């Protein structure tokens, strides 16, 4: 039996680049031995120009209704939680927060894919310009500082080609900020499985120096992503090599509404 029993990073077809029905995703996780499953699809982002990789705002109500019903149906077999993966865009983050106040969102994870709501720079590809990495780290730290996120997803998504030494000071300050704020760093199974260049030993050796806490995230975009126990175990073993604590719980809330 693999050690991958909790996962808070699961997508749905609403994000336009995942497959499978909601029920199929929950069933696949259950069949794989996952005991606690968090659904965290790419959040609608009112005001953002980049909408092709996230659900539309009008789909949010159905998202919560569907998984609320599945939570009841699967009760006693798998513990189901409903949240979102979101990005931090300073110019429209308050608008997103106000939008989410109307829904029973239990948690947010921070996954910074773009440099702005206009989608000017996509961080998922290796780059040659260290200033791109610096901006990514700036946004990730600012997002973590809002206090609304449970953890930082694929923290090493933005990465340099070739010589990694220029990346070190930026990865170092990212890891230090996460530790100071008490937020885990995700070891991303999607990147591990597809050999995307992350999770990277370079980044997590820096996390090891800093003494960060880790969390495993499937980043599942298909029910099939839960289907290979050998991959789940290999990712678990890879994360364990750094000797850092790996958490299996995150804080939940009943609403994002500010008091």
Protein language model features and the residues they cover:
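An N-terminally biased module of ancient metal coordination in phosphate/nucleic-acid-related enzymes
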Residues: 1-90, 161-175, 182, 189, ...
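Domain-core and long-helix interface of multi-subunit machines
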Residues: 16, 109-210
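Short amphipathic alpha-helices and their capping/turn segments at secondary-structure boundaries
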Residues: 22-35, 91-105, 136-146, 173-176, ...
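Well-ordered, non-membrane alpha-helical segments in soluble/globular domains
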Residues: 59-67, 133-137, 232
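Hydrophobic alpha-helical segments and helix pairs
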Residues: 78-123
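Mid-to-C-terminal alpha-helical segments outside catalytic/metal-binding sites
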Residues: 229-259
């Amino acid at each position: 039996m693999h050690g991958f029993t909790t996962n808070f990073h699961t997508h749905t077809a609403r994000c336009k680049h995942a497959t499978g029905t909601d029920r199929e995703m929950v069933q696949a996780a259950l069949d794989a031995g996952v005991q606690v499953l968090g659904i965290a699809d790419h959040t609608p982002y009112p005001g953002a120009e980049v909408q092709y990789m996230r659900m539309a705002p009008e789909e949010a109500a159905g998202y919560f209704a569907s998984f609320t019903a599945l939570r009841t149906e699967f009760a006693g077999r798998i513990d189901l939680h409903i949240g979102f993966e979101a990005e931090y865009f300073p110019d429209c983050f308050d608008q997103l927060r106000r939008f989410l106040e109307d829904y029973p969102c239990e948690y947010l994870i921070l996954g910074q894919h773009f440099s702005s709501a206009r989608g000017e720079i996509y961080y998922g590809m290796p780059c040659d310009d260290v200033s791109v990495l610096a901006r990514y780290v700036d946004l990730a730290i600012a997002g973590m500082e809002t206090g609304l996120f449970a953890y930082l997803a694929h923290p090493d998504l933005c990465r340099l080609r070739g010589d990694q030494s220029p990346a070190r000071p930026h990865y170092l300050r990212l890891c230090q900020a996460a530790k100071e704020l008490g937020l885990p760093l995700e070891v991303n199974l999607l990147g591990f499985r597809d050999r995307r260049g992350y999770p990277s030993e370079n980044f997590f050796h820096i996390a090891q120096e800093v003494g960060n806490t880790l969390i495993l995230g499937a980043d599942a975009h298909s029910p099939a992503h839960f289907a290979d126990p050998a991959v789940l175990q290999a990712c678990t073993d890879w994360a364990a090599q750094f000797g850092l604590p790996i958490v299996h719980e995150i804080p939940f809330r009943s609403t994002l509404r500010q008091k």
